[in-house]
Design a protein with these regions (language model features):
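Short beta-strand edge/turn micro-motifs at domain boundaries
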Residues: 15-21, 29-91, 154-160, 182, ...
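Residue-level marker of positions within ordered structural domains that often coincide
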Residues: 98, 164, 212
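Core segments of small alpha/beta cavity-forming domains
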Residues: 1, 65-135
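Short Pro/Gly-enriched beta-strand edge/turn motifs at strand-loop
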Residues: 3-6, 129-132, 185-190
Length: 233
């Protein structure tokens, strides 16, 4: 469930369409973390529709935006004057998810909870798979048409992007590969398990890109990861 109370809404000053609004929810009474919502409006006569949701990390520092009466300018995937364009940053973050510390872009990004949690999950699964001579592989791909950008008052960009991934796991020694989470179980249903399972995910990642000349690193500030298909191979 997405929290309904709004802490801040960043409205674009751009006069044309399509346009996006970034909305930040409050922390709920049961301590659900804040969400960053991206809502799209394709034309003046259409309603805004929810495009993506990212769960903000504990203690995440978001950039500042112009006050609501002024709004903020929407950015573009090729924005210049940054340590990397939004398109480059998203592509490099996908590479970082794929290759971890061995990624050639590892030094460009600050540590974040999404990579930390994903790494722990992968290690836990690996322990079980390796004991039976099984294998696992995750492939991450940035979606060029799935990037939303809002300029911040310090000259940086807040970017929300879709990064798809496919997680293939093969159990060894005649064993069955089973879902790795309740969300995967719900999609797998009553499918007959085989030695290999393939789960496709949509990962929505929010990141801040500092202006050029800054010593700061690109910083992921929130993420949401959900499986969309889980099937036996």
């Amino acid at each position: 469930t997405i929290p309904s109370d709004i802490m801040q809404t960043v409205i674009p000053t751009d006069s044309g369409w399509p346009r996006s609004v970034f909305t930040i929810t409050t922390t709920t009474s049961d301590q659900q973390s804040k969400r960053l919502l991206v809502l799209d409006q394709n034309s003046a006569r259409e309603n805004f529709k929810l495009w993506g949701v990212a769960r903000l990390f504990p203690g995440a520092q978001l950039p500042k935006f112009q006050v609501p009466s002024i709004g903020s300018q929407m950015g573009q995937v090729n924005d210049s004057g940054l340590v990397a364009t939004p398109a480059q940053a998203v592509q490099r973050y996908a590479d970082l998810l794929q290759n971890g510390a061995s990624s050639k872009y590892a030094d460009e990004f600050g540590a974040d909870y999404f990579r930390q949690d994903l790494g722990k999950l992968t290690e836990t699964v690996q322990e079980g798979i390796a004991a039976n001579n099984g294998t696992q592989q995750q492939v991450f791909s940035a979606q060029a048409d799935g990037i939303k950008v809002m300029r911040s008052s310090d000259g940086g960009d807040l970017v929300v992007a879709q990064i798809n991934s496919v997680w293939t796991r093969t159990a060894g020694e005649g064993r069955e590969s089973l879902p790795a989470s309740d969300a995967e179980k719900a999609l797998f249903g009553t499918t007959t398990a085989t030695s290999t399972i393939k789960a496709s995910y949509v990962n929505v990642v929010a990141m801040y890109i500092p202006p050029a000349g800054s010593d700061a690193k690109i910083q992921a500030v929130g993420a949401e990861r959900q499986p969309i298909t889980v099937e036996a191979q």
